[in-house]
A protein has these predicted regions:
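Short helix- or helix-capping micro-motifs
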Residues: 19, 64, 72-81
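Terminal low-complexity tails and localization/encapsulation signals of metabolic enzymes
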Residues: 166-179
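An acidic, glycine-rich surface segment that forms the CoA-thioester-binding/catalytic face
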Residues: 1-20, 52, 62, 67, ...
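Glycine-rich beta-to-alpha active-site loop
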Residues: 6-52, 82
């Protein structure tokens, strides 16, 4: 897939897209394959493939409906309609809109915020969110999470699982070990 991201489902670290301009077709599919999208106020998104006899087969047709719902996604996909960053934020596939030219800078700031969290908690949280999408109901997605999700089990059995609440109670920053 595009940039090696659209066909990867084994990335345990958060991936942030910083979109400063046009993200159409494959570019939008790459952004949708990321966990977070930070977009410049001038960014534009679209899956215009049907206008040229193609289809967004690198995940766009699968990911967009999961982000914004089937009807909204089909409205974009079947028309190839261009969507502004602000509309993307309103629809739910853009996490944050920033001033033109600073999307990458803001993505780095968000990455720094993520780095203050327990790495095992981040991994477990990301894994649980994506795995839950495979289930038809909320109840089914939660059953067995502690036992069946390796990343969740690793987090629960870690030193960090004790360190976080202890640091909070002691009103100090946690010292994450990642184990």
């Amino acid at each position: 897939g595009f940039a090696g991201l659209t066909s990867r489902f084994d990335l345990v670290k958060p991936v942030i897209a910083a979109v400063n301009g046009v993200a159409m077709g494959g570019g939008f599919e790459i952004a949708l394959a990321c966990d977070l999208i930070i977009a410049s106020e001038k960014a534009v998104f679209a899956l215009p493939e049907p206008k040229v006899g193609l289809a967004a087969l690198a995940g766009g047709l699968n990911r967009l409906p999961r982000h914004i719902g089937v009807k909204r996604a089909l409205g974009m996909i079947l028309t190839g309609r261009h969507v502004s960053a602000y509309e993307g934020e309103h629809l739910g596939f853009v996490n944050e809109v920033v001033e033109d030219g600073i999307a990458l800078e803001r993505a780095h700031e968000v990455a720094e915020e993520i780095l203050t969290c327990s790495p095992l908690s981040i991994r477990a949280s990301k894994d649980a969110v994506y795995r839950s999408l495979d289930f038809a109901s909320l109840e089914d997605s939660m059953k067995g999470m502690r036992e069946e999700y390796a990343a969740v089990r690793q987090m629960i059995e870690s030193d960090d699982f004790i360190e976080g609440p202890k640091a909070f109670a002691e009103k100090r920053p946690p010292n994450w070990k990642g184990r």
